[in-house]
Amino acid sequence: MNKTPTTLIIMDGFGLRKETAGNAIANAKKPNLDRIFASNPGCKLSASGLDVGLPAGQMGNSEVGHTNIGAGRVVFQDLPRISKAIQDGDFFTNEAYVSAMDDCKAKGTALHVMGLLSDGGVHSHIEHIFALLDMAKQRGLSRVYIHAFLDGRDVPPSSGKDFVARLQAKCEALGNAKIGVISGRYYAMDRDKRWDRVQKAYDALVLGEGPFEPDPVNAVQKSYDAGVTDEFVVPVVCCKEAVIGGEDSVVFMNFRPDRAREITRCLVDPDFTDVERKKGFFPLHYVCTTEYDVTMPNVTVAFPHHKLTNIFGEYISKLGLTQLRIAETEKYAHVTFFFNGGVEQVFPGEDRVLIPSPKVPTYDLKPDMSAREVTDACVERIESGSYDVIILNFANCDMVGHTGVYEAARLAVETVDECVARVVEATSRMGGITLITADHGNADRMLEDDGVTPYTAHTTNPVPFYICLLYTSPSPRDYAA
């Protein structure tokens, strides 16, 4: 007997904004979504700040959005949790951090601090990095090296120079810290197994290989002069003595797991082979600020995960219902790991489908990404009648939005419009209901206030939520209107 599905479509990065200038969502031709929004019950939802467990005014992100949706409640996030620990003083007595620093003193080794250097608050926060540097000074460490990964996505694309200048000033004030490596997140924070990128970051960190520039601020400026903004800065070595060596302590200050896993595994997993390790594997005292992966060996965790109970996937499973999670690579972790409360757990009756994301340098080069392939696979499984619930993510509005290329983002929105219609129609044919929403905004703002500079970050704008019972696509002429 065929099941009647309830399909949840999460349009990643699809925010609602009144202003139309630089608004790829408002200006895209999207006859399907326009009709769905006009003819079905719906509302706007807040996807930022306190409503999703973040500090007031903090933009939402994919991890936070999927965690809250999957939990069915406000889940307070790691950003405010760590910030509160700093304010309360508990941060400075954290057992994992203390142990790593005491190990340095006992063995005469160096402390390496890695992290995304920005105040974007999505993967990390510069104030958390500064707090750890203060702690290292207080505990009497003499050799501290910071490996700064530049952002350019959750903050303006050329803001990294100012963050590096702030870090350099902090190092000079403390007197015991130096900037070792500067790298764009494109290399050091890949999450799609693009090991050629990760190799460059690893070689800079461990071998000191890469362009050398002793002035960190000038290193970033040289990249700008070459037309390369923060996200894509090729790993630069600023201090030859700052290479990571055996028995050193490493603290990775990123609190969001997905983009911290690959470079961490390169450093801690003796069985890892996807990146060449010319020095071979060597032991480290490695601290993950949060739990990046329960299978990660040879690490300690500073802020362990708080387990969520009775979340959506768990509840559906307990009812004896079947569920499907489907997305392309860039958002697969979000409909699985994050939707399940940040736990690597597959519930009974839960199936997962991963569609590979296209192998392109940046997604403005292929704004449709793998949305049509995701749709094909989803429709096939809807029509199989095997699932009671389907959780689906379309990555385009977020991933293309992050490139800052307006025209590509507009095309991304139009692709999502086409694909949403196919999924809704398939669900309707099976007698099911489709819920359409988003996790946060992004493509709704592609330009800074000057109307020229690309805006690459998320937004704090609301997102849609609609319940669709029956739907058929408009005629082809509506697409050309």
Positions of the model-derived regions?
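Active-site-proximal N-terminal segment of extracellular/periplasmic enzymes that hydrolyze or transfer
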Residues: 1-40
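Active-site metal-binding loops of divalent metal-dependent hydrolases
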Residues: 13-14, 118-120, 291, 440-441
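Metal-dependent active-site segment of extracytoplasmic phospho-/sulfohydrolases and closely related
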Residues: 412-451
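Single conserved hydrophobic/aromatic residue that forms the stacking wall/gate
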Residues: 471-481
